[in-house]
Each structure stands twice: as structure tokens, then as C-alpha cells.
Amino acid sequence: AIYVLFSDPWPKKRHHKNRIIQGRFLSDVARHAPAGVPLYFRTDHSGYFSAALEIVQAHPDWRVDPEAPWPFELPTVFQQRAESFQSIVALRR
């Protein structure tokens, strides 16, 4: 499994190119991940969540699974600080 938990959202538009969830990152990870491997993404930044969801949905190597359960619910330090958060679970095609 691949976990991307509360990575830097780079909120300024000119910095969006620095976000980890990009097409190239997803392609690089997919190259090393066999079919069926889950990618778990969680953020407390709604703008980053929306952008990441669009990128993952458009990527040919990943399929978003809205019904997939989150594998664990032990709160991270960032999760405890966040007012709310959103998650994506995607499976390698």
C-alpha cells in the first residue's frame, strides 16, 4: 500500500506545481506497484483534495474506489490538529 498523509498542500497557486499528487508522481508509483495496490491519500485542505481527486480520477493507471474502507483509524498528530479531513482511496489498475 502507498500512503500520502497530510502532505504539504502548497496553497498558493504559483506553488501548486510542488504538490506531491501530480500525474508524474502517480505514473512513477504505478510503474513500481502491481495491479490492485491501494493508494491512500488524506488531507485537511479542501482545495488540495479537489485538485488531487481530479488528477487521480483522470490518471489511466489508478481507479478511485469511493466504497473502499480506510485501513486504520489511529489518529495521526496532524489528524488530531485538523478540524476536518478528506480521503481518497485509489487502486492500481
Residue ranges, per PLM feature:
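Class I S-adenosyl-L-methionine
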Residues: 48-93
